[in-house]
Amino acid sequence: MALVAFVFVGAVLLINGLVLLGFVPPRSSVPINLLVGLALAGTAVQIILTTDALGPAPAAGPSPLWSAAGFMLFSFTYLTVAVNTLTGGEGSALGWYCLWAAAISAVITLVQLLVLQDPHLAVLWGAWAILFAAFFLAQATPWAWSQRPAGALAVMQSVTTATIPALLDLAGWWRQAPLALVLGAQAAVVVVYAVLMVRERRRALHPEPAVHTGPLPVTASA
């Protein structure tokens, strides 16, 4: 996938993560979700039309169409987030879509690794598969406590899977980045997410007792 567009994907992941963390009101995230969602859809359509103009798939190669599929996967996510927020829609359908998107992302991971032989992008797609799975847990399950870890994961991945790779790609350095460093960064993010999930689950199962901070009650003396 052309990583230039992921400068803006990084921005959307950051904003949506902050929404899940409670730092940004949901309605204020609508414009950026709409704009980036529409831009990614337009880019995907352009790739498809260009590939068709080049002739049969063997001549054009499989990579452009896989890129278009990836753009549409993210585009539908952001557009659905925007529409749900505008209409006050309940988010379980988006959550189940994210489970499907996680499965597709896993397939694209294998394609990038085994067919297109691009291990750098394979690592990123593996990370996005985990991100979509986290969104499924946050939106389609009764585990409300999983929303904050999912938000933190989105914020971290906005940097490690989108912004930094996109900027490196613009500078022409992405392909030269050590694969071990790329893999290590994504592994570290997933470990942090797992730790947050365990912590939030413990808090949900064993909530801390409320601490009384007001004045002591006055009792009548005998």
Regions found by a protein language model. Name each.
Residues 1, 24-28, 59-66, 90-93, ...:
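Membrane-interfacial loop-to-transmembrane-helix junctions in polytopic alpha-helical membrane proteins
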Residues 1-63, 173-180, 193-222:
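N-terminal topogenic module of multi-pass integral membrane proteins
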Residues 14-25, 78-90, 135-145, 194-201:
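C-terminal ends of transmembrane helices
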Residues 29-35, 92-101, 148-154:
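Cytoplasmic-side transmembrane-helix entry/capping segments in multi-pass membrane proteins
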Residues 37-43, 99-108, 152-165:
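Small-residue-rich segments of transmembrane alpha-helices in multi-pass membrane proteins
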Residues 49-54, 110-116, 166-172:
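Juxtamembrane "helix-exit" motif on the non-cytosolic side of transmembrane helices
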Residues 68-141:
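Membrane-proximal helix-loop-helix units in multi-pass membrane proteins
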Residues 119-222:
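C-terminal transmembrane helix-loop-helix hairpin of multi-pass membrane proteins
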